[in-house]
Amino acid sequence: MSFATFLDQLFAGLGLGFVLFFSAAGLNLVWGVLGVMNFAAGAVYMLGAYLATTVIARTGASTLGWLLALAIVPVVAALAGAAAEVLLLRRTYRAHDENQQFMLTLALSYLIAGGVVLLYGTGLRTVALPASLSDSWNVLGATLPKYTAVVIVLGVLVAAAIWALLYGTRIGLLTRAAVDDRTMLSVLGVNVNRLYTGVFAFGIGLGALGGVVDAPNGAVTTNLETAALVPAFIVVVTGGLGNMTGALVAAVSIGVIESFVTLQSPTLAPLTPYAVMTLVLLARGASGRRLLPTRPTAGG
């Protein structure tokens, strides 16, 4: 393998890895803070991709249209997520009824999927890249597509923003404290319900952002729901439930490994995430080191 080929696969793998991270980060954040495994994450990702096709179609395949999709779609999804948390999930926290949470998020995924089919039909849609992002750069003899570079940079910025929010702000401090003792925070006058709503909305927004970013990479179809949900769960389990650092490392590692496997054996490439997860679980176990030390308490 030449050095240029190595770089080609590395760039492609990093791009894939950060796309995986967007969907997994939202899933992991909601689990780590709220203790809710959001089975609607794949549907949210799919919805983000479809909404991106609408925004870009109305604004033209321009840089401005793509930037508007990046800005508008996650916000719309986050607002819808906030409403879903208030109306559906909030009542389940006190009893920590995981079965009810599973059923509610699963029902939400069916609702989103049904809405997408109703609005867009079942045919495939495509998102054209703006001319400014459709070509590539030559880097040490390798080809780096501009859009891949944008995805990588955006992924780094989003990861940094998540860490800054969690560890550099009062909201992040309260969020982490709510995991340890929600009741105590409530006694101290913190509106924990509002905090949880914000976390869930942020997680939904991240998932929708993943759909927007991934939309130009291929056809946008209803199959995106499963295509996004399964890898996101694999990343979360591989990195450790509730461990945001682990999710980032797992997503990027899986993306890079899958890229190199694709070069050698395209038929085996889809098995890469499962193989990596299996090896990691055998070596480490399923828990890993959590971003947040304990699961949400049942009280408060």
What are these regions (language model features)?
Residues 11, 33-83:
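Membrane-embedded helix boundary and interhelical linker motif in transport proteins
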Residues 92, 98-168, 195-198, 260, ...:
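Transmembrane helix-bundle core of multi-pass membrane transporters
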Residues 1-23, 51, 63-70, 96-102, ...:
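Membrane-interfacial amphipathic/re-entrant helices at transmembrane-helix boundaries
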Residues 119, 180-187, 191-194, 264-300:
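Cytosolic-side transmembrane-helix boundaries in multi-pass membrane proteins
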Residues 32-37, 79-124, 168-170, 226-241, ...:
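Short loop segments and helix-boundary regions at transmembrane helix junctions
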Residues 27-49, 66, 95-100, 171, ...:
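Short, non-helical or kinked segments that cap or interrupt transmembrane helices
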Residues 143-220, 244-250:
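Helix-loop-helix "hairpin" substructures at the membrane interface of multi-pass membrane proteins
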Residues 2-12, 166-170, 196-236, 258-271:
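Inter-helical junctions in multi-pass inner-membrane proteins, predominant
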